[in-house]
């Protein structure tokens, strides 16, 4: 197994699919990385040379991935909550942020039902 951006990449899968195991790299980004490095997206990781894997490592390092991306997302949410804006309040209360209805739906975001006290 090759190790790119601190993630073990499966050897027996195509390069594009293997790169998506990295948090922050989806199909489109993986295809762009393959195009930038000149690596065949259909080639399996085990068939690539060490030089090609190093090129992939360097190209992935140019993107914000894994821990840095998680930290950036959490800091953005924390900033919204500290500002006290509407989106921050919704995050703080654990409700949907993007305008979805909450009268009947949003069970995942709101959590399990709480019994009504009489």
Curated annotation (Swiss-Prot):
Keywords: Ribonucleoprotein, Ribosomal protein, RNA-binding, rRNA-binding, tRNA-binding. GO terms for biological process: translation. This is Small ribosomal subunit protein uS13. Belongs to the universal ribosomal protein uS13 family. The keyword RNA-binding applies. NCBIfam families: uS13_bact. Signal peptide: none annotated. One of its GO terms (molecular function) is tRNA binding. Residues 93-118 are annotated as: Disordered. The gene is rpsM.
